[in-house]
From Swiss-Prot:
Keyword Magnesium: yes
Subunit structure: Homohexamer.
GO biological process: coenzyme A biosynthetic process
Job of this protein: Reversibly transfers an adenylyl group from ATP to 4'-phosphopantetheine, yielding dephospho-CoA (dPCoA) and pyrophosphate.
UniProt GO molecular function: ATP binding; pantetheine-phosphate adenylyltransferase activity
Protein name as catalogued: Phosphopantetheine adenylyltransferase
Catalytic activity: (R)-4'-phosphopantetheine + ATP + H(+) = 3'-dephospho-CoA + diphosphate
Pathway in which the depicted protein is active: Cofactor biosynthesis; coenzyme A biosynthesis; CoA from (R)-pantothenate: step 4/5
Protein family (similarity comment): Belongs to the bacterial CoaD family.
């Protein structure tokens, strides 16, 4: 059985991520989407929220599971019996970074095989960080997000704006 892990922070999951998940689910018998913690990215959603959002977005893909973990991806792969690490590449910068990560993973576990998927042209410019930046400045990014995640993002940004206004009002008193 071909089992793969697709790790990422997915904050938020984009249509580019979802496309990779669909393509991976067609290639592998089982695909585990691993929602990782990366506090340096200043997460908009909690890990639990991201897991729930992704589960909803992939609900039609029977061979896809959504899990969360901390620590080394190769350790996760060993725990769940995965032989393949799935990664998406948007550009040469991604390739250089992912090549180095793949080499380190292979050093840590010589059974870890990284499989690269090239992003489709319509998704090559996307990143969760860019989408958060655009939407926080008032831009409409709904064309790049699954519907459930677009709604969650709108709600979260509205909550943050209301909190900011409340703090500003308290300072003005």
């Amino acid at each position: 059985m071909k089992v793969a892990v697709f790790p990422g922070s997915f904050d938020p999951l984009t249509l580019g991520h979802l496309d990779l998940i669909k393509r991976g689910s067609a290639l592998f018998d089982q695909l585990a989407v691993a929602v990782m913690t990366n506090e340096s990215k200043n997460p908009l959603f909690t890990v639990e929220e991201r897991v729930a959002q992704i589960k909803e977005a992939v609900s039609g893909l029977d061979n896809v599971s959504v899990i969360t973990t901390e620590g080394l991806t190769v350790d996760l792969m060993n725990r769940i019996g995965a032989d393949y690490l799935m990664r998406g590449l948007r550009n040469t910068t991604d390739f250089q970074y992912e090549r180095d990560i793949a080499a380190m993973n292979n050093f840590l576990d010589d059974q870890c095989e990284t499989v690269f998927f090239l992003a489709k042209p319509e998704y090559q410019h996307l990143s969760s960080s860019l989408l958060k930046e655009v939407t926080s400045a008032g831009g409409d990014i709904s064309a790049y997000l699954p519907a459930n995640i677009n709604e969650a993002l709108k709600k979260r940004l509205m909550e943050r704006e209301m909190l900011r206004v409340k703090k500003d009002n308290e300072k003005a008193r």
